[in-house]
Amino acid sequence: MKKKLIVGNWKMNGGLAANAVLLKALKEGLPEGGNAGVAVAVPAVYLAQAQAELEGSAIGVAAQDVSQHESGAYTGELSAAMLRDFGVRYTLVGHSERRQYHGETDAVVALKAQAALAKGVTPIVCVGETLAEREAGQTEEVVKRQLAAVIHQVGQCINELVVAYEPVWAIGTGRTATPEQAQQVHAVLRAQLAAASQQADRIALLYGGSMNASNAAQLLAQADIDGGLVGGASLKAADFLTIIAAAQ
């Protein structure tokens, strides 16, 4: 059975003292010898703290974004090499909030994924449709377009990707795609990956739309849902640990 992956996305939340408490609780509560990979995507200023607090544990450190550039006059940006310096294993790319508030295009997201891979950081490529797009029957078209840009850019490195489906209408709204709705989109993404790779079944597909302690088990039971990209629930140790337990 494929190992599940649970990634907590803290977004722009946290503080030194609160982080220490949360990370300690996660380390102490993580099941020994569990069958799920776990990582936390923390704000960039806390990468060093997270790496230090989690040293020796099975919990990986993830970034929330990465630059498509290697270096240069890009004020405020962080390169993949910089992330590697802090022991970062994963980085989100193309999160809907980056696309919406920072104008990131499919092409930019694809370049970011490529930049991460080049430095040994695993990109978690986020795709998903808005409510208007879903109601217009465009879900499949939108997610396939977003993923196609990345597949084209990374070429033979496709098997090193992680993909997260995050229906934009279900992020932070309390609304969640039903397990059946989520599985339907995941199956579309799996088929798209299979057309580009003979090892598509090894590529982790995460669900990222308001997964919580109550719905995680049902979502994770779906055939093509290989884990979760967890937002608000990852800020509460008990809830996040419940989700991790559901993935075992």
Swiss-Prot record:
EC number: 5.3.1.1
Short name of any one Pfam family annotated for the protein: TIM
Chief place of localization: cytoplasm
Gene Ontology MF term list: triose-phosphate isomerase activity
UniProt keyword Disulfide bond present: no
Enzyme class, broadest EC rank: isomerase
Cellular component GO terms, alphabetical: cytosol
Keyword terms, alphabetized: Cytoplasm, Gluconeogenesis, Glycolysis, Isomerase
SUPFAM superfamilies attached to this UniProt entry: Triosephosphate isomerase (TIM)
GO biological process, one term: glyceraldehyde-3-phosphate biosynthetic process
Transmembrane segments: none
InterPro entries linked: Aldolase_TIM, TIM_sf, TrioseP_Isoase_bac/euk, Triosephosphate_isomerase, Triosephosphate_isomerase_AS
Active site: 95 (electrophile), 166 (proton acceptor)
PANTHER family: TRIOSEPHOSPHATE ISOMERASE (PTHR21139:SF42)
Subunit (UniProt): Homodimer.
Assigned protein family: Belongs to the triosephosphate isomerase family.
Protein purpose: Involved in the gluconeogenesis. Catalyzes stereospecifically the conversion of dihydroxyacetone phosphate (DHAP) to D-glyceraldehyde-3-phosphate (G3P).
Record protein name field: Triosephosphate isomerase
Organism: Delftia acidovorans (strain DSM 14801 / SPH-1)
